[in-house]
């Protein structure tokens, strides 16, 4: 077979295959061009989800007839000089989009330069240009793309339904709109207005907040912490959800690098790490986060669609993002989601008061800010005989409830819920969830500070497991478990002998503890990094620590728990994302008794 040069039209169609995957790709490229052109208003019109027609109009700087002639050629751009290749500030720079789109569609471009007398128009069919003509148009540019992929009909087979393709276009417009709150966006599909966003001309935080409300909704804002974090060459701003407001997928995580929407595994992992103490593995935070970084420290020329980036120092970026998120969350560490129970019971406070933790070290790098001073007014009492009857009203404590964020305990219901009174509300605490969170904080604190003390068993316990595999797994990890204050040895083929356990677990069921550890670790603990194994083991410890919570509590024990919640960050949710408390405002309760 003879080697030959490809024709210009074939080259453009190949390039289109890399850049233009679907109608949403066209929308993205044209809208980004409009933004680079200095637009303050962008209109998008679609027919059949963009398969039949895509129109993007803007009020940007426009083009002259000579610029229009050059713009539709491959590798032509006004946005990049050779010296700027590693200092890119614009969305477009490759000079491929218009030529690639024109190669697979019927394109009509009409443009008028600002303060020019005339507008000009050029038509392209399958990449073949026609003569530029004089036209009538307002300042700015309008690009019409008809019959997408008509020149490459095989690509049409890979398009999804109109509903799916339309959703992709809406998604990309929303992402771009989030990054540009000063620009107005209008999206129309089949004569129906689907998105109308008015540009704001206020300070950056107000602009961003209003745009997020317009695009995502105010529920997210009410359940989010504001991020404002700066270093000499890096800044992060945006909103990230409090731990109790989460979802089962990561689709509502909007990440931007220099206002460019991206999907980056490094940043997604950083999000997971920032929330690892508060969210289960199958739950995801919601966020709109903007990272501004020196363009010379990030390479956006990794993917033809510019959806991926490469950082000069990825570990630094990762650590900075984790610290920024943790700092933001610390400021709202005792807020529970406003949506909890709101659909089930209108009495649940929709705007809970922010309870800032007292005696808290708010450094984001620490595991927890729990205060373990021994001379506090209330301390954790030993688990012994409980004389207080369940549900029995507790005499008013000498301390006024006005002094405490969670008030003073008044009663316990069904050995599960604590009822406390504050100055203007009733707080209902799920004691099991609260103890679970408390246990997590204690264990993490003790691990970090080397205070996870071993307790030697008076009589070592022999635990027989269901298989040799499980026994071998535990024995192979005995050194790692020893660092977690659990001392074990092999005792026969399927048995383990336990001589020491963590003191914090108290009078724990050793048989059940070891069985649970074996069940959880046998499938994937081999060669597991110590840090990851620690997370697994801690969660098992917590379960056994909090088992003791479902019992009768004395007045002192209940108030002790409330005080410890006040002194603990992120006390609003347990480790399974359930709220530890809900608050009923007195004014809401009074509504029930009105005629």
Curated annotation (Swiss-Prot):
Q: What is the lineage of its organism?
A: Bacteria, Pseudomonadati, Pseudomonadota, Alphaproteobacteria, Rickettsiales
Tell me the GO BP annotations in alphabetical order.
mismatch repair
Question: What NCBIfam families would the database entry show?
Answer: mutl, PRK00095.2-2, PRK00095.2-4
Pfam families listed in its UniProt record: DNA_mis_repair, HATPase_c_3, MutL_C
Q: Which organism is it from?
A: Rickettsia prowazekii (strain Madrid E)
HAMAP family, A to Z: DNA_mis_repair (MF_00149)
Keyword DNA damage included in the entry's annotation = yes
The protein's name: DNA mismatch repair protein MutL
- PANTHER family noted in UniProt: DNA MISMATCH REPAIR PROTEIN MLH, PMS, MUTL (PTHR10073), DNA MISMATCH REPAIR PROTEIN MLH1 (PTHR10073:SF12)
Stored PROSITE patterns: DNA_MISMATCH_REPAIR_1
Family annotation (SUPFAM superfamilies): ATPase domain of HSP90 chaperone/DNA topoisomerase II/histidine kinase (SSF55874), DNA mismatch repair protein MutL (SSF118116), Ribosomal protein S5 domain 2-like (SSF54211)
What family, per the record? Belongs to the DNA mismatch repair MutL/HexB family.
């Amino acid at each position: 077979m003879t080697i030959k040069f490809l024709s210009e039209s074939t080259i453009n169609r190949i390039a289109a295959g890399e850049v233009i995957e679907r109608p949403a790709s066209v929308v993205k490229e044209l809208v980004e061009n409009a933004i680079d052109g200095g637009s303050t208003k962008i209109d998008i019109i679609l027919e059949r989800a963009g398969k039949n027609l895509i129109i993007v109009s803007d009020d940007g700087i426009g083009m002259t007839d000579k610029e229009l002639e050059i713009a539709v050629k491959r590798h032509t751009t006004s946005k990049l000089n050779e010296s700027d290749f590693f200092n890119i500030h614009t969305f477009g720079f490759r000079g491929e989009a218009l030529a690639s789109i024109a190669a697979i569609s019927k394109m009509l471009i009409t443009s008028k330069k600002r303060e020019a007398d005339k507008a000009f128009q050029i038509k392209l069919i399958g990449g073949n240009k026609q003569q530029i003509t004089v036209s009538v148009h307002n300042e700015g540019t309008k690009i019409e793309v008809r019959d997408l992929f008509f020149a490459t009909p095989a690509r049409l087979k890979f398009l999804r339904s109109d509903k799916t393709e339309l959703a992709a276009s809406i998604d990309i417009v929303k992402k771009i709109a989030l990054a540009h709150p000063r620009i107005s966006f209008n999206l129309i599909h089949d004569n129906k207005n689907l998105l109308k966003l008015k540009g704001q001309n206020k300070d950056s935080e107000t602009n961003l907040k209003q745009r997020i409300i317009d695009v995502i909704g105010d529920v997210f804002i009410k359940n989010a912490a504001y991020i404002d974090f700066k270093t000499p060459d890096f800044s992060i701003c945006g909103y990230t959800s409090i731990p109790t407001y989460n979802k089962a997928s990561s689709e509502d995580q909007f990440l931007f690098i220099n206002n460019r929407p991206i999907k980056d595994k490094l940043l997604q992992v950083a999000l997971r790490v920032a929330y690892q103490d508060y969210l289960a593995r199958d739950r995801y935070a919601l966020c709109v986060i903007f990272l501004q970084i020196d363009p010379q420290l990030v390479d956006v020329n990794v993917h033809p669609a510019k959806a991926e980036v490469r950082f000069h120092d990825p570990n630094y970026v990762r650590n900075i993002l984790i610290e920024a998120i943790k700092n933001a969350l610390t400021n709202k560490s005792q807020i529970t989601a406003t949506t909890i129970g709101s659909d089930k019971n209108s009495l649940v406070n929709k705007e809970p008061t922010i309870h800032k933790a007292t005696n808290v070290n708010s450094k984001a790098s620490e595991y927890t800010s729990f205060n373990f001073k021994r001379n506090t007014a209330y301390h954790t009492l030993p688990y012994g005989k409980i004389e207080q009857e369940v549900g029995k009203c507790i005499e008013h404590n000498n301390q006024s409830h006005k002094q405490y964020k969670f008030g003073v305990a008044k009663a316990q219901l069904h050995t599960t819920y604590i009822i406390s009174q504050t100055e203007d509300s009733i707080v209902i605490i799920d004691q099991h969830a609260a103890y679970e969170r408390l246990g997590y904080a204690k264990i993490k604190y003790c691990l970090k500070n080397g205070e996870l003390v071993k307790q030697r068993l008076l009589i070592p316990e022999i635990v027989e497991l269901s298989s040799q595999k499980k026994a071998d797994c535990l024995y192979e990890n005995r050194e790692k478990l020893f660092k977690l204050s659990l001392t074990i040895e092999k005792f026969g083929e399927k048995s383990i002998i336990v001589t020491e356990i963590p003191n914090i677990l108290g009078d724990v069921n050793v048989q059940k503890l070891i069985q649970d550890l074996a069940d959880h670790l046998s499938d994937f603990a081999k060669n597991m990094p110590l840090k990851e194994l620690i997370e697994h083991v801690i969660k098992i410890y917590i379960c056994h620590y909090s088992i003791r919570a479902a019992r009768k509590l004395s007045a002192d024990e209940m108030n002790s728990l409330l005080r410890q919640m006040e002194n603990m960050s992120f006390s609003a949710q347990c480790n399974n994302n359930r709220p530890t408390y809900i608050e009923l405002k007195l004014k809401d309760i009074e509504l029930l008794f009105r005629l």
